[in-house]
């Protein structure tokens, strides 16, 4: 960062985690080795700046690597995340990682972030977590527009669509679990919806392969 801004086409290191930006100064990837750590203090100003002019009212500054897993607090580890993603789906993934770390296993993650055109706000975040030679891929829809429907298992699309119709919800994330031979073992599709009083709820469809 120079004067609080990320630089274009740069690779930089924060707390041992490696980040890459594109020619629009946006973080597009992060390779990390999360560890349990004291929670780094928040940088509220940096969190409020994430997404710039493309930030939406429901967005928060979401840490790519959690502050309690040796993730930096500043703008180099932040993207604009919809609050439903940041506080639920992404947090669920972080809790999965922390549980794995608590089992004494080494964990590595690779995060890939995609954007629409020149927007500073991500459309999709994909995190590949490797632990015990097994991979888990988490896909997050930051727009909550059901664009992940195309990535659900073909044989269960009807069941997933029925659940979407019942709840009037959207697919907020997908979790794919693989074995050591990289065979897909289980897919969990998470659906976010509101009830009549406006409270957010989540439900899921689990598909075994």
Specify the residue positions occupied by each region the protein language model found:
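Domain-level detector of nuclease and nuclease-like folds
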Residues: 5-196, 200-207
């Amino acid at each position: 960062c120079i004067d609080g801004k990320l630089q274009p086409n740069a690779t930089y290191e924060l707390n041992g985690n490696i980040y890459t930006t594109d020619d629009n100064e946006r973080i597009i990837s992060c390779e990390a080795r999360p560890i349990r750590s004291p929670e780094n203090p928040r940088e509220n100003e940096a969190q409020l700046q994430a997404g710039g002019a493309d930030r939406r009212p429901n967005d928060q500054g979401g840490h790519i690597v959690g502050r309690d897993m040796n993730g930096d607090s500043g703008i180099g580890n932040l993207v604009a995340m919809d609050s439903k993603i940041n506080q639920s789906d992404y947090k669920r993934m972080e809790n999965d990682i922390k549980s794995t770390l608590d089992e004494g296993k080494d964990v590595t993650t690779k995060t890939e972030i995609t954007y629409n055109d020149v927007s500073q706000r991500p459309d999709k975040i994909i995190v590949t977590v490797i632990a015990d030679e097994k991979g888990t891929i988490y896909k997050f829809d930051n727009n909550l527009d059901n664009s992940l429907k195309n990535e659900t298992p073909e044989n269960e699309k009807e069941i997933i669509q029925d659940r979407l119709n019942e709840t009037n919800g959207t697919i907020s994330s997908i979790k794919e679990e693989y074995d050591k031979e990289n065979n897909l073992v289980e897919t969990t599709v998470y659906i976010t919806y509101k009830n009549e009083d406006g409270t957010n709820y989540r439900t899921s469809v689990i598909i075994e392969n």
